[in-house]
Amino acid sequence: MPLDGVKNIVLVLSGKGGVGKSSVTLQLALALSLQGKSVGILDIDLTGPSIPRIVGLEDAKITQTPRGWLPVSVHPPENTAQDGAPPRGALRCMSLGFLLRDRGDAVIWRGPKKTAMIRQFLSDVSWGPTDYLLVDTPPGTSDEHIALAEQLLTLASTDPAVASSMGRPRLAGAVLVTTPQAVATSDVRKEANFCVKTQIPALGVIENMSGYTCPCCGEVSNLFSSGGGKVMAEELGIRFLGTVPVDVKFGELVEGKMVVDSDSDEEDGPTQAQQPEEPVDNRPLVERYKDCWSYSRFEEFAKTLISQIESGSAAS
């Protein structure tokens, strides 16, 4: 059965490109995992799949089994809770990027082929037990979105009672991502209208790149405008989940540049040429993410979404 084992499906949408949908998707997935939830990421940005890169698994390959494709594991579950935190859930992901022969290959497909690929992603991937499947989408309301909505409304249900009685996943709703600027919010309003027309509940709005987090002290400075996402959410009657400043640490994390902090700041120490290479942090991605400034914000987003979805209070 398609999507067998998946409980809840959450779309991550934006009408504007470059607002950080993929980074928001990954951070939501990591935060949900740290709340003890088993999470999957489905990347349907077919012409620009970025999930393999930002999880550091560009060279991973998909395994074909009699049950379908097995998604790539980002990290396994961890049943040993620490400091009173819930046990860590597993995180798996699926992307066209894992199926390309070369990471630099261009995907030049017309609508019917894109539609067929999305249908295959939704029917032929063996996710296993998954509490939340996050779907990272391309910008706009293109062929991918239409195919996704049509297929999900067939395979899943937005009504939790119907989903439970029929043994289907619940299409819990969509998280809308924007930046504060009017040029972004105007396009995201169209995405909200797409949700209304397809009857997909809007779970909330995240205002990404709202300010800049100082990597030294953590203070947030509003270098550009802020608040546009909140105003838009209030006007549309959608829950405003919060703002996310630019986080240099998260950028270093997904670029694979995070190193173990050193206590040595002496000016008269060895020269740069003489200094040994700084030790690389080999902890799993999810554990390194907890050191990022943005983690605390996404932890709250994850808790809000869990409460909202599992209590059945998503707004239509």
Curated annotation (Swiss-Prot):
Keywords: 4Fe-4S, ATP-binding, Cytoplasm, Iron, Iron-sulfur, Metal-binding, Nucleotide-binding
Assigned GO CC terms: cytosol; cytosolic [4Fe-4S] assembly scaffold complex
GO BP annotations listed: iron-sulfur cluster assembly; tRNA wobble uridine modification
Molecular function via GO: 4 iron, 4 sulfur cluster binding; ATP binding; ATP hydrolysis activity; ATP-dependent FeS chaperone activity; iron-sulfur cluster binding; metal ion binding
Residue ranges, annotated region (Disordered): 260-285
Cofactor needs: [4Fe-4S] cluster
Domain of life: Eukaryota
Subcellular location field: Cytoplasm
InterPro entries: Mrp/NBP35_ATP-bd, NUBP2/Cfd1_eukaryotes, P-loop_NTPase, YlxH/NBP35
Keyword Iron-sulfur: yes
Residues annotated for [4Fe-4S] cluster binding in this entry: C214, C217
Residues bound to ATP: G15, K16, G17, G18, V19, G20, K21, S22
Stretches of the chain forming a coiled coil according to its record: none
Transmembrane segments: none
Cofactor note: Binds 4 [4Fe-4S] clusters per heterotetramer. Contains two stable clusters in the N-termini of nbp35 and two labile, bridging clusters between subunits of the nbp35-cfd1 heterotetramer.
Subunit architecture: Heterotetramer of 2 nbp35 and 2 cfd1 chains.
Protein family membership: Belongs to the Mrp/NBP35 ATP-binding proteins family. NUBP2/CFD1 subfamily.
Purpose: Component of the cytosolic iron-sulfur (Fe/S) protein assembly (CIA) machinery. Required for maturation of extramitochondrial Fe-S proteins. The nbp35-cfd1 heterotetramer forms a Fe-S scaffold complex, mediating the de novo assembly of an Fe-S cluster and its transfer to target apoproteins.
Protein name: Cytosolic Fe-S cluster assembly factor cfd1
Organism: Aspergillus fumigatus (strain ATCC MYA-4609 / CBS 101355 / FGSC A1100 / Af293)
Gene from which the chain derives: cfd1
